[in-house]
Design a protein with these regions (language model features):
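Long, low-complexity intrinsically disordered regions
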Residues: 1-216
Length: 216
């Protein structure tokens, strides 16, 4: 058995930072899509956050590794301004709401299946009180997508103490369909999500890729 290698705290920090791409040399010229793809291939996930102080959260990891870069190039790769069916990243739940390479979508289908097994309490309430709503929202997206939550025509409820998001039932239905993979984000305008059928957003070769088994 080989001897155990010991690292100091400083060495361990440097290893961790290098693994995340911080040791790579920055481009000397204009940053383009090739450089951004290199970062995305390395880190695989860009967390999305609605909080906007300095800049939107998903722009910052790329900036930290490349320095100034054209944000519209990242937008194009993420699908926010990509041609339908050609985004290189898509939105879904990883450790949090994130942008993820489209090629990893099959690896997240286990989580999409879980939406049927473990529905949210709000969805159980809707299924009991308004069972037609989910089908109505599905049809609305099919006929008119991409749509915003506001396009469901359901008003936002009065603010409730302790409830951060205060979603109306139309938004809950869309987010549930998003969780189960039936819809995805087609674009964002002023950071507002537009939902459309996943089959109209993601590349067909991704959608037709086999689903790994639970053991895999």
């Amino acid at each position: 058995m080989s001897a155990l290698t010991r690292l100091s705290a400083g060495q361990a920090r440097r290893v961790a930072l290098a693994a995340q791409g911080f040791a790579d040399p920055r481009p000397t010229g204009r940053v383009d899509a090739r450089h951004i793809r290199r970062v995305l291939d390395r880190i695989a996930i860009l967390q999305i956050d609605s909080v906007n102080v300095f800049s939107r959260a998903h722009y910052l990891p790329v900036f930290a590794r490349l320095g100034p870069y054209p944000r519209e190039t990242l937008d194009r790769l993420t699908g926010y301004t990509a041609a339908p069916g050609r985004p290189e990243m898509f939105e879904y739940w990883a450790h949090a709401a994130s942008l993820i390479p489209v090629g990893l979508q099959p690896l997240l289908r286990w989580r999409m299946r879980r939406a049927h097994v473990e529905p949210w309490p709000a969805i159980r309430r809707i299924a009991k009180d308004n069972p037609e709503l989910l089908d109505d929202v599905r049809q609305l997206v099919t006929d008119n997508g991409p749509i915003r939550a506001g396009d469901t025509g359901i008003p936002r409820p009065a603010p409730r103490p302790g409830h951060m998001w205060n979603w109306h039932d139309g938004k809950v239905a869309l987010e549930y369909l998003f969780y189960e993979g039936w819809v995805t984000t087609a674009k964002r305008i002023n950071f507002e999500r537009y939902y459309d059928l996943t089959e109209r957003v993601l590349p067909p070769e991704v959608l037709s890729a086999p689903t790994p088994s639970d053991d895999d």
